[in-house]
Amino acid sequence: MRLNCFILTVLLAVSCHGTAGTDMPEWRWPDKEEPAFVEPYPAITNLGWTNVTGAYSTLPEGIGIYRSPETLDGNKVIAYIAVADLSKVAWDVRSIDDPTIQGTTDPLKTPAEYYKETSAPVIVNGGYFFAEGGKRYNASVAVSGGRTYGVNINYASKDWVTMYYPTRGVFYEKDGARQTGWTYWSGGAKHYLYDAPARNSWSKDPLPVPDASFPVTAVDFAPETAIGGGPVLLKGGKVENTWEAEMFYGDGADDKMPEARHPRTAIGVTKDGLLILFVCEGRGMTDGVAGMTFAEEAAALQSLGCVEALNLDGGGSSCLLVEGKETIKVSDGSQRAVGSVVLLKKR
């Protein structure tokens, strides 16, 4: 036993002597360097927009968030865009269920409530809506997974004696293509899509009720995903801004709405297929920031490379959430409950 202990002691001594005072070997391989950040969309940052994607921690690959420069065309602005590579992320719509403008008891929800339900990384308010007699109504197209949840309202009147039948704007996806157009729902089985609007005006007599051949030859409207609103801002790379033809405003104070600055929301697509969700702050929530006119909104989206773009519900409805956090200050002071939202999600 004593012999074994002696041998063990000698071995330990030799071992310690062999390493005492000897430095550990140097690491022969350099530490791996983090790759340098490469801006994915320099055409956007070259316009003065700032990439703020790094402020968010859980965005899936394919989504970028950008903040506008302090001014656009001399106008003080606060605007944000979400840029989506649709090969990596998808866009979708959530809405109350009112496919025939008959109303529903479905509740309106704030974007934050939609976020709580979906955990979608990006959510923006969608189309027009209204509430009356204890029911909620869609006034704009809403389609998800090929199922219709809302149609564009198909009538307009100032006195409920003279009736107009406007075609109103839509942004839709079908067979991998995303574009704008104008729709009319007949009140029955027919839902028409047009490449041009009926050129109605409050200052003129009503045009005929849209059908398969008026205002231009129609196709059946059967998209996979769609959101309505209006006016159409861009089509085929050109500014449209068809607010008068779509009959959003009539006599009175609202006449100035298209040319006044307000919070705005829009959806568009570039010639390279990037989806852009746009929102701008307004109504003095930040000192000196009034918002944008339709024309200014169209110009901003065109400068960002959009070739198709649709204005969505704005004003107090305008709200863009990223990871559930507000970007602009909403003009109602708190988020408005809305009828529909557009969201981005990982494919």
Question: What is each of the regions a protein language model found here?
Answer:
Residues D85-K88, A131-E132, Y172-Q179, L234-G237, ...:
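Short acidic-glycine loop/turn motifs at beta-strand connectors
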Residues H17-G188:
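Zymogen propeptides
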